[in-house]
A protein has these predicted regions:
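RNA pseudouridine synthases
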Residues: 2-332
Length: 332
């Protein structure tokens, strides 16, 4: 079992234990750090600690026993994945909307991980027993490009890139409303909602979160944006845009407040928006450094059919409103 020894620096005094651990290259993520602490793999000054929130002092000596990858007890399942690239180290693919990334309570099977295990037969186990190969996630109802690691070395390299925010990620988002500016940035810390624990919110002492956005097209009552992530927090784009008054169309958690705009639209367009049962968010671009090939790689993929159909309906609605078509065009 590999070991990390580390002496807390003066400028690191007051940090949470899991916060400092997650900055180390050997630790895949903050959730991994928390799991290692709770599993009694971490000592401070020769004493085992079990609280990830333990505040550190200048001069504390940390000793971390890196646990070996857990054996995988998951059932491979057949499924259709559009693969953009694959080699012995990693696989790049398109996750469809509606697919949960990894098993959890209530989703023990039928996940992306189960499908990857069937296709790849072997994945990096460093992310934990239920998250083999997973170095980043997309929400269940968000579609788009993902990368998974096939071995531990690649997993560590990719995880560090995500941690250092050097991975290039862009998303296409259809939002309610017309933005006044053509582009901008949202720098607002995120954390758990103080009341609804299923939601994320902008909170004063949350984790740093930065989203850059640019308007691609404005329709009658909606706008199509390209959003680039500088950080990658849970629900980041969804919460940031909603906090600015432009929630994503179809978002069940953060987008309900803008349905009043439907009354200004023709019935077919109104119906299309009402019946779009997921957030209109698609991970369209992904770029990273391939550790095995030692080169930068970039991938792009257009939005899926349901998203394209919605955008076509918005274009027709726009055309009718501008006098370039008739309401009957929307019914075709």
């Amino acid at each position: 079992m590999a070991e990390i020894k580390y002496k807390v620096k003066k400028e690191e005094e007051g940090l949470r234990l899991d916060q400092l651990l997650s900055k180390m290259n050997e630790v895949p993520s903050r959730s991994s750090a928390q799991r290692w602490v709770k599993d009694k793999h971490v000592q401070i000054n020769k004493t085992i600690v079990e609280s990830p929130s333990r505040k550190l002092k200048w001069g504390d000596i940390l000793e971390v026993m890196i646990p070996p990858p857990k054996s995988l007890d998951l059932r491979p399942e057949k499924g259709n994945l559009e693969i953009l690239y694959e080699d012995n180290d990693l696989i790049v693919f398109v996750k469809p909307a509606g697919l949960v990334v990894h098993p959890s309570a209530g989703h023990e099977a039928g996940t992306l991980v189960n499908i990857l295990l069937e296709h790849c037969h072997d994945l990096s186990g460093i992310g934990g027993a239920t998250r083999p190969g997973i170095v980043h996630r997309l929400d269940k109802d968000t579609s788009g490009i993902m990368v998974s690691a096939k071995n531990d070395k690649t997993h560590q390299h990719l995880a560090k890139q995500f941690k250092d925010h050097s991975v290039r990620r862009s998303y296409q988002a259809l939002v309610w409303g017309i933005l006044k500016n053509k582009k901008g940035s949202i720098n607002a810390p995120l954390g758990r909602h103080p009341v609804n624990r299923k939601q994320i919110a902008v909170v004063p002492n949350g984790r740093r979160a930065v989203t850059h956005w640019e308007v691609e097209h404005c329709y009658s009552n909606t706008s199509l944006l390209t959003c680039r992530l500088e950080t990658g927090r849970t629900h980041q784009i969804r919460v940031h845009l909603s906090s600015q008054g432009f929630p994503i169309v179809g978002d069940p958690l953060y987008g309900k407040s803008s349905h009043h705009l439907l009354k200004f639209m023709n019935e077919p367009a109104k119906s299309a928006l009402k019946n779009f049962k997921r957030q209109a968010l698609h991970a369209c671009d992904l770029g990273f450094f391939h550790p095995g090939r030692e080169e930068e790689m970039d991938f792009s993929h257009p939005a899926p059919k349901d998203y394209k159909n919605l955008l076509e309906m918005m274009e027709l609605e726009d055309s009718v409103k501008n006098g370039h078509g008739s309401p009957k065009d929307l019914e075709r």
